Swiss-Prot record:
It comes from Lymnaea stagnalis. This is Guanine nucleotide-binding protein subunit beta. Guanine nucleotide-binding proteins (G proteins) are involved as a modulator or transducer in various transmembrane signaling systems. The beta and gamma chains are required for the GTPase activity, for replacement of GDP by GTP, and for G protein-effector interaction. CDD domains: WD40 (cd00200). Belongs to the WD repeat G protein beta family. GO terms for biological process: signal transduction. It comes from the Eukaryota. WD repeats lie at residues 54-84, 96-126, 142-171, 183-213, 225-255, 269-299, 311-341. Keywords: Repeat, Transducer, WD repeat. The lineage of its organism: Eukaryota, Metazoa, Spiralia, Lophotrochozoa, Mollusca.
Length: 341
């Protein structure tokens, strides 16, 4: 039995190497060569424009609304807060049944927010009730591991990723799981939906990223290259590429059409993992959130670092760029959110 397993293991390694070689052969140029004539970005200096105070404990997650004004944040204090980023006012403060929350999401319509975590449940809250109060409109149980990330497709469907090594698509109206996306061999830590919401990418503790089709539930592509857990993943604004952040202290850029990694963002001085990533609206800048409390700003084309967002007194746990590209928000264990531009 063990001999058979070893033979199969060797065979899979050989096949993986063949795929690697085939991909290499198809790569006719490198990102550095292709961008050699492009001007460098120059130093990026962002200032804190707003500080959102109201949480009483560590902030674990945040997500911008599609109006680029409101945002939602989730904290260990057991509250989900919807903020007006212009005025810094709290629009809603929603008490949660479980304070062990790891992710939150704002629906594209602005009608709903969602959250989940160690309770293994994705809870959906309606912000537009007739009575004016916010209430749980649906709880989606079904994952057998913690909920690591959730993102709305529309008002009636949401995609979740979980520590049970799967992702799922849910029908919010019925509360049923309509599709299960299986194939990762480690906890799925993060997901990102494409701009047209037809596909999503996931990053997992098996050090691979996968591209899934929302409509047929199939894994279309698998991307390897990282040497440790992938903690964060985000689509490039045009939907043809995505970036990942990993415990191997690198961010990487994968091109979907080239079917391979085309860029790596690392520095000898950076030895800690990355836990969230986000692109600027143009896609020229990549923001990475590191375990040493810092946020580095990378020039995507030149693969060089061009600035740091420093201003929190504790670990930065989450970051997000507005849809219109006008601002970046960071959330921290110091209980504050900061908005930069």
């Amino acid at each position: 039995m063990s001999n058979d397993l070893e033979a199969l293991r060797q065979e899979t390694e050989q096949l993986k190497n063949q795929i690697r070689e085939a991909r290499k052969a198809a790569g006719d140029t490198t990102l550095a060569q292709a961008c050699s004539g492009v001007e460098a970005v120059g130093r990026i200096q962002m200032r804190t424009r707003r500080t959102l105070r109201g949480h009483l404990a560590k902030i674990y997650a945040m997500h911008w609304a599609s109006d680029s004004r409101n945002l939602v944040s989730a904290s260990q204090d057991g509250k989900l807060i919807v903020w007006d980023g212009y005025t810094t006012n709290k629009v809603h403060a929603i008490p949660l049944r479980s304070s062990w929350v790891m992710t939150c999401a704002y629906a594209p319509s602005g009608n709903f927010v969602a959250c989940g975590g160690l309770d293994n449940i994705c809870s959906i809250y309606s912000l537009k009730t007739r009575e004016g109060n916010v209430r749980v409109s649906r709880e989606l149980p079904g994952h057998t591991g913690y909920l690591s990330c959730c993102r709305f497709i529309d008002d009636n469907s949401i995609v979740t990723s979980s520590g049970d090594m799967s992702c799922a698509l849910w029908d919010i109206e019925t509360g049923q799981q309509t599709t299960s996306f299986t194939g990762h061999t480690g906890d799925v830590m993060s997901l990102s939906t494409s701009p047209d919401f037809r596909t999503f990418v996931s990053g997992a503790c098996d050090a691979s990223a996968k591209l899934w089709d929302v409509r047929d539930g199939m894994c279309k592509q698998t991307f390897s290259g990282h040497e440790s857990d992938i903690n964060a993943i985000t689509y490039f604004p045009n939907g043809h590429a995505f970036a990942t952040g990993s415990d191997d202290a690198t961010c990487r850029l994968f091109d979907i059409r080239a079917d391979q990694e085309i860029g790596m963002y690392s520095h000898d001085n950076i030895i800690c993992g990355i836990t969230s990533v986000a692109f600027s609206k143009s896609g020229r800048l990549l923001l990475g959130r590191y375990d040493d409390f810092n946020c580095n700003v990378w020039d995507v084309l030149k693969q060089e670092t061009h600035g740091v967002l420093a201003g929190h007194d504790n670990r930065v746990s989450c970051l997000g760029v507005t849809e219109d590209g006008s601002a970046v928000a960071t959330g921290s264990w110091d209980s504050f959110l900061k908005i930069w531009n």
